[in-house]
Amino acid sequence: MATQPATESVQCFGRKKTAVAVTHCKRGSGLIKLNGCPIELFQPEILRFKIFEPILLLGKHRFAGVNMRIRVNGGGHTSQVYAIRQSIAKALVAYYQKYVDEQSKKEIKDILVRYDRTLLVADPRRCEPKKFGGRGARSRYQKSYR
């Protein structure tokens, strides 16, 4: 049995509320696929631009040498989009750290953090559960004294 050389790949995830996106990033020709479809076909268009933010910020030349396969599930449309963009950014940073060099990784990280910190750091806010004695998490039923 011949051993094949290990492919240069990293796997990163992004989270927003209950949405989780996992990105497999490996050496390639610049293809980015989302659930098996090209990322350019993602609908609606407004949310597609949100996904393209890390790509437009860093420039296509940084993505030219890598292929990305993204799987996303859970949450709503907007949460999924935020999870996707976070996983793309984190995967590229991890790939550059592991297989390129520390200097360009730091450059990428600085650009992303200066633009939007949530591209690399998850938002810890979650929905607060409902309690008894009211309609929601904090609101209470009206109280009558007479």
From Swiss-Prot:
GO terms for biological process: translation. It holds the Pfam family Ribosomal_S9. PROSITE patterns: RIBOSOMAL_S9. One of its GO terms (molecular function) is structural constituent of ribosome. Keywords: Ribonucleoprotein, Ribosomal protein. The keyword Ribonucleoprotein applies. GO terms for cellular component: chloroplast; cytosolic ribosome; cytosolic small ribosomal subunit; mitochondrion; plant-type cell wall; plasmodesma. The keyword Kinase does not apply. Belongs to the universal ribosomal protein uS9 family. PANTHER family: RIBOSOMAL PROTEIN S16 (PTHR21569:SF16), RIBOSOMAL PROTEIN S9 (PTHR21569). This is Small ribosomal subunit protein uS9z. The gene is RPS16A.
